[in-house]
């Protein structure tokens, strides 16, 4: 257990690079994270959560450049959305590249990506040169929590490190999810970013 992400960047980077599992604060809720290239780590996260692999897992990336590693057909409209709201609490569902693991891809060969508004987390991803899983740190079917002790009770013994976040607002919302796999933008989940914010983009 570590006190803050800022003071734990080196150890978190080492743990993730070595295939470990971490619970990390983001700009929204806690994430259950590992590097995306380690199949064993991905399987372990699915087992910890009790999550069906067919659901996929959202991926956090440090910059817009990483979108091209995981996704395809990223046109100017999608780039405009990314540049408008990221880093920030918006997740985009995109068409995945063929070589992306099925353990992190969603239905219909999709992938969910976002850039978190957390400079320490971005530093870690840049250091390890990888995106990380951003699935919520809770058991599948349970509501996400910002209560450190509840998370420790449910998941604390199953991960390699848990870094506390300075969450002052206890009702912090998860990211908004947009499906941009077709010409029509679909709001899958309205979270921290509202529908009106999306509608106000000038394409």
Task: Report each predicted region and the residues it spans.
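Active-site-adjacent structural elements in enzyme catalytic cores
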Residues: 1-203
């Amino acid at each position: 257990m570590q006190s803050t992400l800022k003071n734990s960047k080196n150890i978190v980077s080492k743990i993730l690079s070595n295939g470990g599992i971490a619970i990390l604060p983001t700009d929204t809720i806690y994430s259950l994270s590992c590097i995306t290239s380690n199949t064993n780590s991905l399987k372990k996260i699915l087992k910890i959560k009790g999550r069906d692999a067919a659901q996929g897992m959202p991926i956090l990336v440090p910059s817009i450049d990483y979108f091209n590693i995981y996704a395809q057909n990223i046109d100017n409209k999608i780039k405009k959305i990314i540049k408008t709201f990221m880093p920030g609490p918006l997740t985009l569902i995109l068409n995945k590249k063929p070589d992306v693991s099925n353990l992190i891809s969603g239905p219909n060969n999709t992938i969910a990506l976002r850039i978190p508004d957390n400079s320490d987390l971005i530093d870690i991803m840049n250091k390890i040169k990888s995106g990380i899983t951003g699935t919520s740190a809770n058991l599948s079917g349970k509501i996400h929590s910002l209560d450190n002790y509840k998370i420790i009770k449910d998941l604390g013994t199953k991960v390699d490190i848990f870094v506390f976040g300075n969450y002052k607002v206890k009702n912090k919302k998860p990211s908004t999810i947009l499906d941009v796999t077709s010409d029509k933008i679909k709001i899958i989940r309205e979270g921290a970013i509202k529908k009106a914010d999306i509608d106000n983009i000038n394409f």
